Amino acid sequence: MARFFRRRKFCRFTAEGVKEIDYKDLDTLKGYITETGKIVPSRITGTKARYQRQLATAIKRARYIAILPYTDSHFN
């Protein structure tokens, strides 16, 4: 039987030396949102708790000022 190799999770923000996550940085935020609009949990992304809290706050701020959608576009 073949064994599956799991890729080691790491925090991208720690590796890059990011101090604060900006709510205006949409390219970064979109990487942590599912196609339905949910915030991806840190156990899947590998993000540290400190940055996960900042990420959640930044996503919620971006949603509030209508930069990011709350949900997907509901087209059938």
UniProtKB/Swiss-Prot annotation:
GO molecular function, one term: small ribosomal subunit rRNA binding
Keyword terms: Ribonucleoprotein, Ribosomal protein, RNA-binding, rRNA-binding
Keyword DNA damage on entry: no
Record keyword RNA-binding present: yes
Pfam families: Ribosomal_S18
Biological processes annotated in GO: translation
Any single GO CC term annotated in Swiss-Prot or TrEMBL for this entry: cytosolic small ribosomal subunit
InterPro entries with a match to the protein in the record: Ribosomal_bS18, Ribosomal_bS18_CS, Ribosomal_bS18_sf
SUPFAM superfamilies in the cross-refs: Ribosomal protein S18
Function of the protein: Binds as a heterodimer with protein bS6 to the central domain of the 16S rRNA, where it helps stabilize the platform of the 30S subunit.
Self-association and partners: Part of the 30S ribosomal subunit. Forms a tight heterodimer with protein bS6.
Protein family according to the UniProt entry: Belongs to the bacterial ribosomal protein bS18 family.
Protein name listed in UniProt: Small ribosomal subunit protein bS18
Native source organism of the sequence: Marinomonas sp. (strain MWYL1)
Gene: rpsR
